């Protein structure tokens, strides 16, 4: 499944003669892929990268899989930091490990609050509307239409009662475009959600529903110098054919960091 998105946004630069010349962003396709994999994957992954960097995005995601407890899908924040610190040609931009929601709130309002927090944790200025629309849709999916995700690998129902539902929900975003420059940014994040409603009702929540929520968020943003791959598509989805730690002498610099 894919949808076409054409950007009409322009930038202007000054030429040698002092005249302005428009820089027109290239059109792009937003493609959603569902592929078989022999590798354990407990993230709801969203990649916003050029094709030659899919390999890198996949293997960064696979690296952070090691921070997830396979028994209960709990995201170990300290383990994630250890993994991040061991990835070459990379740097940690920002981290977050705290409660972010403790209130009775409409889900649509909570989604906007969490989107702003993610923008802050990402630590990069990303101007792509399409990317942020994908982020918003993924956050909505953390709290709505859960009946369609009940058995997915990124969600774990860890405490249920007649008056409360608690679950883990793991997401990973990767972005590489003109805003990130010579690096790829990866943002693994985990929501620990507790809502004062029974599970059967939570499964069918919409963005217009309200409830008492407590949400803890664990996240970090890591950037790694780009290295492209021309591997056949079959090899791209086989982690055994790729080495995340191969030699790369690019230097991480000139990041477009938000304040």
Curated annotation (Swiss-Prot):
Pfam families (UniProt xref): Bac_thur_toxin (PF01338)
Gene Ontology biological-process annotations: sporulation resulting in formation of a cellular spore
GO cellular component: extracellular region
Alphabetical UniProt keywords: Sporulation, Toxin, Virulence
PTM description: Active after proteolytic processing.
An annotated Gene Ontology molecular function: toxin activity
Recorded family membership: Belongs to the cyt1/cyt2 endotoxin family.
Quaternary state and interactors: Homodimer (protoxin) and monomer (active toxin).
Function: Kills the larvae of dipteran insects by making pores in the epithelial cell membrane of the insect midgut.
Protein name: Type-2Aa cytolytic delta-endotoxin
């Amino acid at each position: 499944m894919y949808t076409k998105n054409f950007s009409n946004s322009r930038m202007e630069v000054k030429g040698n003669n002092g005249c302005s010349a428009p820089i027109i962003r290239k059109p792009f396709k937003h493609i959603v892929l569902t592929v078989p994999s022999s590798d354990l994957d407990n993230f709801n992954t969203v990649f916003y990268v050029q094709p030659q960097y899919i390999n890198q995005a996949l293997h960064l995601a696979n690296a952070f899989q090691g921070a997830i407890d396979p028994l209960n899908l709990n995201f170990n924040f300290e383990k994630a930091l250890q993994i991040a610190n061991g990835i070459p040609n990379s740097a940690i931009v920002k981290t977050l490990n705290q409660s972010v929601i403790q209130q009775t709130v409409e889900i649509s309002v909570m989604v906007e609050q969490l989107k702003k927090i993610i923008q802050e944790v990402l630590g990069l200025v990303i101007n792509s509307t399409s990317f942020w629309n994908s982020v918003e849709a993924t956050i909505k999916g953390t709290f709505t239409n859960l009946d369609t995700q009940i058995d997915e690998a990124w969600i774990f129902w860890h405490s249920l009662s007649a008056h409360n539902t608690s679950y883990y929900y793991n997401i990973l975003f990767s972005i590489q475009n003109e805003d990130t420059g010579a690096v790829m940014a990866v943002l693994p994040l985990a929501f620990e959600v507790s809502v004062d409603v029974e599970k059967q009702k939570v499964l069918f929540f919409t963005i217009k529903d309200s409830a008492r929520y407590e949400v803890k968020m664990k996240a970090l943003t890591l950037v790694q110098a780009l290295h492209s791959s021309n591997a056949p598509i079959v090899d791209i989805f086989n982690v055994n054919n790729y080495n995340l730690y191969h030699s790369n002498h690019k230097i991480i610099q000139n990041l477009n960091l938000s304040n």
